[in-house]
A protein has these predicted regions:
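Conserved class I S-adenosyl-L-methionine
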Residues: 1-51
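A generic alpha-to-beta junction signature in SAM-dependent methyltransferases
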Residues: 49-50, 93, 142
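Class I SAM-dependent methyltransferase SAM/SAH-binding core
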Residues: 56, 62-107
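A conserved beta-strand element that flanks and buttresses the S-adenosyl-L-methionine
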Residues: 118
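Short catalytic micro-motifs in class I SAM-dependent methyltransferases
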Residues: 121-122
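A short glycine-rich, Lys/Arg-flanked "PGG" loop and its adjoining helix->strand segment in the class I
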Residues: 132-144
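C-terminal alpha-helical "lid/dimerization" subdomain adjacent to the S-adenosyl-L-methionine
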Residues: 151-198
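Conserved Class I S-adenosyl-L-methionine
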Residues: 184-220
Length: 225
């Protein structure tokens, strides 16, 4: 794990910085996604997860996962804060009934309930200070009997990230093809610690490794019918 010393502004700047990074990255996002050698394993993991009914995808990006969800869902809503990402996602999903919402998930309020909320590599972008509020929002968005389904990076990914030191919110530096540098929240979990944290927040969670670098999980509100 690499680390540099830099003072980074605290909340709420982390959110706008993160959105700015993904807005700038939109044009090159698909190239990096398509070069990921682990994608077949992740898609197989998705096949084992209970994605069905009315589905909400949080942080849909350019729609790479959206296109895998649409046939599993009765209805599909895809949310992202970056208009440049959504423009590509809308083009990708043209001809489907996918509903797109441009909103910052940290200030968004759902206008309906969902059977499944899907998070692909988003949970690691939720800072610890927002974790409880975020999962309260997830509970609010779920229909009774619904679940949160997620895929994400494990702690092993720390060896390839450049973490910025002296920040209250765990932050990594990312460089784009044009040489510009950006900051994003990055919180890495292992399966046992994330399971424990979600249990403490009132969820029945089951998190399992997919490989050395990724995990998949399902979480349901404790006591849900």
């Amino acid at each position: 794990m690499h680390s540099t010393r830099e003072q980074v502004p605290e909340e709420p700047d982390w959110s706008q910085r993160q959105i700015g990074y993904y807005r700038a990255r939109a044009a090159e996002y698909d190239k990096a996604h398509n070069e990921r050698t682990h994608m077949p394993r992740l898609v197989r993991a998705l096949d084992e997860l209970p994605v069905s009914g009315d589905v909400l995808e949080v942080a849909c990006g350019t729609g790479q996962w959206t296109q895998l969800l649409v046939d599993r869902a009765r209805s599909l809503t895809a949310l992202d804060a970056a208009p440049e990402m959504l423009r590509i996602a809308r083009d990708r999903m043209r001809g489907t009934t996918t509903r797109f919402i441009e909103a910052d998930i940290f200030t968004w309020e759902p206008d309906r309930l969902y059977d499944t909320v899907f998070l692909a590599f988003w949970l690691s972008h939720v800072p610890p200070v927002e974790m409880e509020a975020f999962w309260n929002l997830m509970r609010w968005a779920l229909r009774p009997g619904g679940c949160i389904v997620f895929l994400d990076d494990s702690t092993a990914k720390a060896e390839i990230e450049e973490f910025v030191a002296e920040t209250r919110v765990p932050t990594v530096r990312r460089m784009l093809a044009d040489g510009s540098q950006h900051l994003a929240v990055k919180v890495l979990y292992d399966a046992p610690s994330l399971t424990s944290q979600l249990n403490d927040l009132g969820w029945e969670a089951h998190v399992e490794p997919i490989d050395a670098y990724h995990f998949a999980g399902i979480a349901r509100p404790r006591g849900s019918e």
